Amino acid sequence: MAVNGISRYIRLWNHVANPAEYILRKGERHHRDLHFTTKPLPVHFRVSAALYQVFKELFMADVYEIDALVNTLPADPVVIDIGANAGFFDIQLLSKVDRATIYAYEPMPANVETLRHTLQQNPRLQQSVRLFEMAVTGQPLDWLDLFAEAEENDQVVASRFAGFNENNTQTITVPCVTLTDIIWTHDLRSVDLLKMDCEGSEYDIIYHTAPELLRRISRMVIEVHDMDKGRNNIGAFDAYVRSLGYTTTHAPINSFCHALEAVRR
């Protein structure tokens, strides 16, 4: 569950070695990138103004409760990251565990460029993160139209739904892969963690992946967005995931988005 108030600064102190970069220099973010180093294992990465809120969600609000999450994983976990964004979740994870095998999927060019730069700056991460510039779907598609902000440098969050965000006025077309194909192509007989933050696509992905493949996943952490009153809302989604044999918990992030954690029974 996301933290707030002074607790955010405690989490920041726990996760980065140079919290003063945020505390003293966050006002400079519109003029230069902020630069951070994680702890206990050092990962060097940059945060642009466009990524500022994403950074705060993970390293301050700590929406994935990363320390508690890591304690549930094996020493060398296999992870699928759908909606990797600029890789902040992968950075956070690899600041806590020395090794992992992460299949990271991100369709937005600006995010991919940022994550590639981070990988180049941190050779250890190159051994763990396999980056794919693709969107993930449930039903097979070769290409998918995503709606994003007009300015290329601000295109850090996009959705397949035109009305998801009123600022998403530009369409970009990206290549796709299904979760089914990810599991089969990489011969993933077991997956320790599926992390998913894909702005409404979570329904297509989970509802259209065979239950026997989903059950290969031990744990899931998913941002679930309320899209309608039918099947595309937290109540229906939670019930479906539980029907697959998972124990679930969820908590609101904001008025239309929820953090759901599912553990296979």
Label the model's feature ranges.
Residues 1-265:
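Phosphate/nucleotide-binding beta-alpha loop and adjacent structural elements of enzyme active sites
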